[in-house]
């Protein structure tokens, strides 16, 4: 699992995710990975939460086929994604973003394993997960978001939000954790392309990195 935060409107998408991959049961850190992936020739972004193997399988499939737009991709996903990803048992959601061929407005789609990867068109809004730390006061996060948009500090807002998500997640029992860490990556998708940055590292980045190197899990 992972942290996933996304602001959508008709002209752009701003997405932030962390880079820590953990074992689905023990939540032991396994590696650092990039979870936001681009398909530049159609100005499309694919990312997801849950099974990395499922997400990577779908990205590989997309790159093996002749696709001209997010419209094509969504149509193919509705038909083919369930057949490709049925073998992966972990709860998984795949997100795809791009611009409509006719209106040139941004489209976002979610495909959830528990709904057999049925295509769901996303609303223009701000979505975030995990959500529990704001479950009793969801209005506060929207107020923070609006203030940061006005002040042109959206990247810092997304990083601070993810820090809160990580702090909350780190305190949970192992079977409740999603596992958040590494680097906060932020992507901005617009009509003329996209920009992906490694915004900031979390405080325990070096500690986890040292453990992975020591255990020969990355070299």
Label each residue range with its predicted role.
Residues 1-219:
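N-terminal nucleophile
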């Amino acid at each position: 699992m992972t942290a996933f935060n996304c602001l959508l409107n008709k002209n752009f998408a701003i997405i932030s995710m962390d880079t820590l991959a953990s074992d689905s049961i023990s939540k032991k850190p396994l590696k650092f990975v990039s979870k936001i992936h681009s398909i530049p020739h159609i100005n499309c972004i694919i990312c997801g939460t849950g099974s990395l193997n499922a997400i990577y399988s779908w990205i590989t499939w997309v790159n093996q086929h002749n696709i001209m737009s997010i419209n094509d991709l969504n149509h193919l996903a509705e038909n083919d994604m369930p057949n490709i990803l049925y073998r992966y048992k972990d709860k998984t959601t795949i997100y795809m973003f791009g611009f409509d061929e006719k209106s040139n407005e941004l489209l976002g789609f979610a495909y959830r394993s528990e709904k057999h990867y049925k295509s769901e068109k996303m609303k223009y809004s701000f979505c975030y997960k995990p959500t529990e730390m704001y479950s009793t006061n969801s209005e506060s996060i929207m107020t923070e978001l609006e203030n940061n948009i006005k002040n042109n500090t959206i990247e810092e807002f997304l990083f601070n939000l993810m820090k809160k998500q990580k702090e909350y997640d780190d305190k949970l029992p192992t079977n409740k954790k999603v596992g958040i860490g590494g680097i906060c990556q932020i992507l901005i998708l617009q009509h003329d392309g996209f920009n992906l940055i490694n915004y900031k590292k979390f405080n325990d980045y070096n500690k986890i990195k040292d453990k992975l190197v020591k255990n020969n899990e990355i070299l």
